[in-house]
Design a protein with these regions (language model features):
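Generic beta-structure capping elements
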Residues: 50, 58-61, 127
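Arg/Lys-rich, alpha-helical DNA-contact motif
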Residues: 51-56, 68
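Vicinal oxygen chelate
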Residues: 3, 31-34, 46, 78, ...
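Short amphipathic alpha-helices within nucleic acid-binding modules
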Residues: 20, 83-89
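Helix N-cap motif at beta-to-alpha junctions
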Residues: 13-14, 81-84
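Eukaryotic phosphotyrosine signaling hubs
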Residues: 4-6, 72-76
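Exposed loop/turn and edge beta-strand positions of beta-sandwich/beta-sheet ligand-binding modules
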Residues: 41, 72, 108
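Core segments of cupin and vicinal oxygen chelate
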Residues: 2, 8-53
């Protein structure tokens, strides 16, 4: 049996990324320096939803190389209990949604999209009744 463990994104600013994902409600779990041949090559930062095993791994490469998101990436969805509260925390951190939250159908889920500091799109979903 397989199980889902993590998704990894490459980042350019660990402090900005940490502030963003903590404002989303993810908890910072650990930092893992990657050393090869005596040199610090990268640092991995792990985040997760409290009470869940799956993680988001953010990798910062210390050599300064840059990355292109490409055309194949769409988004990752994160469920939130209170979309308005999450949006307020993000706004306090200087992060605006791509557009105001909206419902897919009457009485259904509400959602909005935001981008992290590296341009990764995150869909925030508050499930409806």
């Amino acid at each position: 049996m397989a199980r889902y463990l993590h998704t990894m994104y490459r980042i350019t600013d660990p402090e900005k990324s940490r502030a963003f994902y903590e404002a989303l409600g993810l908890e910072f779990r650990r930092e893992l320096p990657i050393v090869r041949d005596g040199e610090l090559e990268a640092t991995n930062y792990f985040f997760g939803v409290p009470g869940q095993e799956e993680e988001l791994e953010l990798t910062f490469n210390h050599d300064g190389r840059t990355y292109d998101l490409g055309t194949g990436y769409g988004h990752v969805a994160i469920g939130v209990d209170d979309l308005d509260g999450t949006r307020a925390r993000l706004k306090d951190a200087g992060i605006e949604p791509e557009r105001e939250p909206y419902s897919v159908r009457e009485g259904g889920s509400r959602l909005c999209f935001v981008q992290d500091p590296d341009g990764y799109r995150i869909e925030l979903i508050e499930r409806g009744g």
